[in-house]
């Protein structure tokens, strides 16, 4: 889901780094090269606020504005990796239904090809870089970070933290077909950790990621979609897909004894609802109709767009601290457990 880019002059956000434009990146006087990936609305707003006429924006793409994920809100940007972008998207389609380990290794391979192409296009006058996390280790491999300062725009947890969270979940879950299907190579994990430690700023709207970098994290404000006024209800929902790392086992325990079956959104990728009655629904227009609360015990969430939609519509969320939302926008999973003991059903009235 892509939302319109907002103006920093009219968005009304005061907790965002962009509330005082120019402070966020503490930009140096030299030319800045921005090497970015997907145009998240939060990052696009930042670029729109801070990009200077002499700056350089290098992004993937096939033609300007296509695919839509690369639709940056500026005219002054260059497609520096067209053939590599085509290869990336073809590969993504080819492995879309492959096991997670195969998909992730494919993505990393093509990220490397794109990053090296972008590195070759960096203006020699650029002494500071703002780089997407996807490109970070490969830009270093290409020598593009040498003699330059850089900020990192983070869209996922660092590999080291991903591994830690997955190992922690695996220890609780036991056997799973997917919880251990991918681990990045140790050299890549170490390189990313070293480069993140060197970065001047870590830029992200994700509160969990930002918490890993105290004193250096620059918070962006999540863009919330406009409210849709869904039909009121008191049903409890689990935000899928159903896969071990989303922790449906926790949702099962929390909703045991409820009068109505748990609503499970998204595809079922692992058989984890055996002997449990659920009501399956698809994520589409009106998906929040009748929902009184959302359970989201996922091991980690990188881009919580559906959670943001729930927040915008006043639907209570019970989630882990790795969900990415601001603490005021969700309640800890433990709060739902305590309430569930006190009452067999959480209604829209008691959840507010």
State what each model feature region is.
Residues 1-82:
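N-terminal subdomain of nucleotide-sugar transferases
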Residues 46, 222-285:
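Conserved catalytic-core segment of nucleotide-activated headgroup transferases in glycan assembly
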Residues 93-101, 152-187:
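Acceptor-binding helix/loop patch of EC 2.4 sugar-transfer enzymes
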Residues 113-121, 158, 171-201, 289:
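Membrane-proximal helix-turn-helix segments that form the acceptor-binding/catalytic region
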Residues 285-286, 304-312, 323-326:
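Short alpha-helical segment that forms part of, or immediately flanks, the ligand-binding pocket
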Residues 292, 314:
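A short alpha->beta transition loop at the rim of the catalytic pocket in nucleotide-sugar-dependent
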Residues 299:
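Aromatic "clamp/platform" in nucleotide-sugar-dependent glycosyltransferases that forms part
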Residues 316-320:
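Short hydrophobic beta-strand element within catalytic cores of glycosyltransferases
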């Amino acid at each position: 889901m892509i939302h319109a880019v907002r103006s920093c002059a009219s968005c009304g956000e005061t907790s965002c780094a962009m509330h005082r434009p120019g402070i966020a990146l503490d930009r140096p006087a030299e030319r800045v090269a921005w090497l970015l990936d997907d145009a998240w609305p939060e990052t696009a707003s930042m670029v729109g606020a801070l990009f200077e006429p002499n700056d350089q924006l290098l992004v993937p793409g096939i033609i300007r504005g296509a695919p839509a994920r690369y639709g940056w809100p500026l005219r002054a940007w260059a497609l520096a990796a067209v053939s590599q972008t085509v290869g990336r998207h073809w590969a993504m389609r080819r492995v879309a239904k492959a096991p997670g380990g195969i998909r992730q290794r494919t993505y990393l391979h093509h990220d490397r090809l794109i990053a090296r192409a972008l590195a070759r296009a960096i203006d020699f006058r650029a002494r500071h870089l703002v780089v997407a996390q996807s490109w970070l280790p490969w830009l270093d491999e290409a020598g593009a970070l040498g003699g330059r300062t850089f900020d990192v725009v983070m869209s996922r947890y660092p590999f080291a933290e991903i591994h830690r969270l997955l190992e922690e979940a695996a220890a609780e879950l036991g056997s799973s077909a997917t919880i251990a299907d991918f681990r990045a190579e140790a050299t890549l994990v170490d390189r990313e950790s070293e480069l993140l430690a060197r970065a001047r700023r870590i830029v992200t709207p994700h509160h969990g990621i930002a918490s890993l970098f105290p004193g250096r994290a620059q918070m962006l404000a999540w863009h919330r979609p406009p409210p849709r006024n869904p039909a009121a209800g008191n049903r409890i929902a689990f935000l899928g897909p159903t896969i071990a790392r989303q922790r449906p086992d926790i949702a099962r325990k929390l909703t045991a004894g409820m009068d109505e079956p748990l609503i499970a959104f998204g595809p079922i990728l692992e058989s984890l609802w055996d002997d449990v009655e659920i009501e399956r629904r698809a994520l589409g227009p009106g998906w929040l109709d009748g929902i009184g609360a959302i359970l989201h015990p996922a091991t980690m969430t990188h881009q919580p767009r559906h959670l943001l939609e729930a927040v915008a519509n006043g639907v209570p969320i019970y989630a882990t601290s790795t969900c990415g939302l601001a603490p005021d926008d969700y309640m800890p999973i433990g709060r739902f457990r305590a309430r569930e003991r006190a009452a067999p059903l959480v209604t829209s009235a008691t959840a507010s």
